[in-house]
């Protein structure tokens, strides 16, 4: 029996990340090689012509799984009946802009998109916020879409998670698929804490802790962390454009693991609504280690946290509280 198509919304679809993401979705990388999709693409009126060009290319690519394309500048039309929403559209910070100006632009975008999703998306729609500030945009979306279950609103820290896997893999010259269970704690910003204390590598004699194999705590506690934290800026410097290919790929990873499930014994990082686990204040969207089963994520409990980790986890929580306060001040 062929599966019913899943409707996937991508906002900011004419942008760089959108252009990298929509073919991945249409190829089955996000939801599986046997899952038909209908793509809903939303962008601002200024980008309408470019958006139509992306639609033309999707038609030209003749993707067997792609059963339809909606390309629109109307949020209601874009959100109607969607099962998965990937929120890539946002207002990027430009030179000379204050944080509050950027925040206030994004608060108004996410407030209006929240109400369109709440009124028109399919029940149990899963939402992934990619646009920065991702954690706080997701929090605003949650506030203004109260009927969407809070467990269905997440933000992307899988890009940071994958960057951390990549750094360990390069350092040890092992395939990245042999490295697992790094953790990104906190905000998708330069205060995030990439943690390898629970990470392992598959070797010929079983799984070994990353710390034991790297044998260089100075690197793991220093350069490794700063490289992952600053990787986005390094890519902008090299490419003169922000990371799009890796962001799109990690968005697919995030949704796929959420929908299909994580492999036994593996956890991944997702920005989710805090319930107070690991003494992270409730009411923030914070990146935690999670496992996924039957379309639901669960925070991994009981991992030992050392003092150095605690400090870094608290620091990024503090930044998220400040961002939350700033966002709320834009609302009043």
UniProtKB/Swiss-Prot annotation:
* Alphabetical keyword list: Cytoplasm, Isopeptide bond, NAD, Oxidoreductase, Tricarboxylic acid cycle, Ubl conjugation
Question: For the cross-link Glycyl lysine isopeptide (Lys-Gly) (interchain with G-Cter in ubiquitin), what are the residue positions?
Answer: 119
Q: Name one Pfam family in it.
A: Ldh_1_C
Positions of NAD(+) binding: 16-17, 43, 90, 113, 132
Q: Which domain of life is it from?
A: Eukaryota
Location within or outside the cell:
Cytoplasm
Q: Write out the residues that bind oxaloacetate.
A: 99, 132, 163, 188, 243
The primary site where this protein sits is cytoplasm
Q: Does the keyword tRNA processing apply?
A: no
Which family is annotated? Belongs to the LDH/MDH superfamily. MDH type 2 family.
According to the record's subunit comment, the protein's assembly and interactions are: Homodimer. Interacts with 14-3-3-like proteins GRF1 GRF3 and GRF8.
Q: What is this protein called?
A: Malate dehydrogenase 2, cytoplasmic
Q: Which organism is it from?
A: Arabidopsis thaliana (Mouse-ear cress)
- Lineage per the UniProt record: Eukaryota, Viridiplantae, Streptophyta, Embryophyta, Tracheophyta
């Amino acid at each position: 029996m062929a599966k019913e198509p899943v409707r996937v919304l991508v906002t900011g679809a004419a942008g760089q990340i959108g252009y990298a993401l929509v073919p991945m979705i249409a190829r089955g990388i996000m939801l599986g090689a046997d899952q038909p999709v209908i793509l809903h693409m939303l962008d601002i009126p200024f980008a309408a012509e470019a958006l139509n060009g992306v639609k033309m290319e999707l038609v030209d690519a003749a993707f067997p799984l792609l059963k339809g394309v909606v390309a629109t500048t109307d949020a209601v039309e874009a959100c109607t009946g969607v099962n998965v929403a990937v929120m890539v559209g946002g207002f990027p910070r430009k030179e000379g802009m204050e944080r509050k100006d950027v925040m206030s632009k994004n608060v108004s975008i996410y407030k209006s998109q929240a109400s369109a999703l709440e009124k028109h998306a399919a029940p149990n729609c899963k939402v992934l916020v990619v646009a920065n500030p991702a954690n706080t945009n997701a929090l605003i979306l949650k506030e203004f879409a109260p009927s969407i279950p809070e467990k269905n609103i997440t933000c992307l820290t899988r890009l940071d998670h994958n960057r951390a896997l990549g750094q360990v893999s390069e350092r040890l010259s092992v395939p990245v698929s042999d490295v697992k269970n790094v953790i990104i704690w906190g905000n998708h910003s330069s205060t995030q804490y990439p943690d390898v204390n629970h990470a392992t590598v598959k070797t010929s004699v079983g799984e070994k802790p990353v710390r034991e194999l790297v044998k260089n705590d100075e690197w793991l506690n220093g350069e490794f962390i700063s490289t992952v934290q600053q990787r986005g800026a390094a890519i902008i410097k090299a490419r003169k454009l922000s990371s799009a290919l890796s962001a799109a790929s990690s968005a697919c990873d995030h949704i796929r693991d959420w929908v299909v499930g994580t492999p036994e014994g593996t956890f991944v990082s997702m920005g989710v609504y805090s319930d107070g686990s690991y003494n992270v204040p409730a009411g923030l969207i914070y990146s935690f280690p999670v496992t996924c089963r039957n379309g639901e994520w669960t925070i991994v409990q009981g991992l030992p946290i050392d003092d150095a980790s605690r400090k870094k986890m608290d620091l990024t929580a503090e930044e998220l509280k400040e961002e939350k306060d700033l966002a709320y001040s834009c609302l009043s």
